[in-house]
Structure formats: C-alpha cells, structure tokens
UniProtKB/Swiss-Prot annotation:
GO terms for biological process: mitochondrial translation. Part of the 50S ribosomal subunit. This is Large ribosomal subunit protein uL2c. GO terms for molecular function: rRNA binding; structural constituent of ribosome; transferase activity. Residues 225-259 are annotated as: Disordered. It is found in: Plastid, Cyanelle.
C-alpha cells in the first residue's frame, strides 16, 4: 500500500495523507456477508456514556469475518481484496469449492487467484490456517485463538504479526506485537503471515473533520472543565489541577497506573508482560 499526499490547497489538505487503495480489487461488498449494525455511540443500555469521544460518523455495513476458519480441508480461492470501514486491515473474499463464500483478514502477499486452506495438513503458506502444533518455529502468524474452536482473538490489526518461539508439552510460546510473551494451547489455530496494510500507521489525519467522519468526537482536557465534570476542573483563570498527581474523571490515579486486574486466570500463562 502506498500513501498519497495532498498539496496545501486548504489548511485541511496541508498535512493530509490517505491510502492509495491500489490493492483494492472490488468496491462493493458481498451482500450476503453484510448487515447493518446498530452503533452504540459510546453508550450503555441506559444511555449513559461509558466510552468517551465516540459518536456520529459515516454509516457502515458490518462485514462478517470468518475468524474461526472452520471449513477444514475445503480449498478456497481468493476472489477479491476489499476495503472494510470497520477495521484498519483489508479483507479478502474467499470462494470455497463447496460453493460457500467468506471473508478473512487480508495477509501481506495474498493476491487474487491464490488458493488458501485450513486444517492440520494445510501447507505452510501465507493465508493458510493451521493448529499451532503444526506451525514451524519462528513463523510469523496472526488471528490466533486463545480457546480452541472459539475463533481468532489475538493479532488482528493492520501490519501486526506474532512469532512462534517454542513448543513444550500442551503449550506453545508466542511473542506478541506488544512485546508480551505468553503460553497458548497447541490445539489453537492461527493463520500464517503478517496482516497487510502496515503503512496505515504513517497516515496523517490532517483535519478534525476527518476524525468526525470516523466517529471520533473531540477530546476535552479535564483542566478546562467545571469541577462537577472533572477533578481537574474549576479555579479562576488558568488554574493548576490542585492535586499532587493527575487523576481520571472518577478520581483514580492516571498516567502510569497499571489497569490490568490482579489475580486474573491467565496470569500463569504470561511469561513476560507487555512493554
């Protein structure tokens, strides 16, 4: 994927860059694999904001992605590579030999016309899904299951990949993109290769309105709010926060406080915490 920049015709285009979308081969999604999903806008079932800075944005059709790859031993042909507004990775449309269709995450190097397979005897090639026990050491993988048969949960964003480091007993050792090293059961499936569209991290938004198209609302600093809205708020003029350390809107310590729950079931599976 190449990145296209704009000339400074307006302040909004001065620093704006976009993807060229040169790898996209089909503009309209497969209708049978889409549905209109209600957007929560950061609210819970009572209408109370639980996630800030969300709301608005363009309407989207949700594409049903096959994270399980449960059509074992059925060859599939890559029919198209499509844009997905719900994620930063591209998606690949598969036509299975039994007549079914499905979407998977597009792996780097996967092209239209390629054949992909899923199962313990699948070849070690980009886009194929195998149990971790059958994947060679040092292989780059993505879409990794945490529970056998549940579907891929780890390493699903653009440009990311994990590495298989070791196999011992019923577990394999993985190095995740965050730097975390952990055990995963060897029966779990993973897909070979790195997810494409890695250059997405180099794109410059350029203007505030483009974030609004994406459904991202402005982030207001706590120090400019009223005391009723934030512990940092209030005061006459430009006042300091009035505390020894910054806190969240709910009064919990911010900036550096670890937020992972203690005594979590997976603590004994993590060899080294993320960096």
């Amino acid at each position: 994927m190449a990145i296209r920049s704009y000339k400074a015709y307006t302040p909004g285009t001065r620093n704006r860059t976009i993807s060229e979308f040169s790898e996209i081969t089909k503009s309209e999604p497969e209708k049978s694999l889409t549905f209109l999903k209600h957007r929560k806008k950061g609210r819970n079932n009572r209408g109370i904001i639980t996630t800030a800075h969300k709301g608005g944005g363009s309407k989207r059709l949700y594409r049903i992605i096959d994270f399980k790859r449960d059509l074992k031993l059925v060859p599939a042909k890559v029919a198209a590579i499509e844009y997905d507004p719900n994620r930063n990775a591209r998606i690949a449309l598969l036509h299975y030999q039994n007549g079914e269709k499905g979407y998977i995450l597009h792996a780097r190097g996967l092209a239209v016309g390629n054949m992909v397979y899923s199962g313990p005897n699948a070849p070690i090639e980009v886009g194929n899904s195998l149990p971790l026990s059958e994947i060679p050491l040092a292989t780059e993988i993505h879409n990794i299951e945490l529970t056998p048969g549940k579907g891929g949960q780890l390493v699903r964003s653009a440009g990311s990949s994990a590495q298989l480091l070791a196999k011992e007993g019923n577990y394999v050792t993985l190095r995740l993109p965050s730097g975390e090293m952990r055990f995963v059961r060897k029966e779990c499936y993973a897909t070979i290769g790195q997810i494409g569209n890695a250059e997405i991290s180099n794109i410059s938004i350029g203007k505030a309105g483009r974030n609004r198209w994406l459904g991202i609302r402005p982030t207001v600093r706590g120090v400019v709010k009223n005391p009723v809205d934030h512990p940092h708020g209030g005061g006459e003029g430009r006042a300091p926060i009035g505390r020894s350390t910054p806190v969240t809107p709910w009064g919990k310590p911010a900036l550096g406080r670890r937020t992972r729950r203690t005594k979590k079931y997976s603590d004994n599976l993590i060899i080294r915490r993320r960096k």
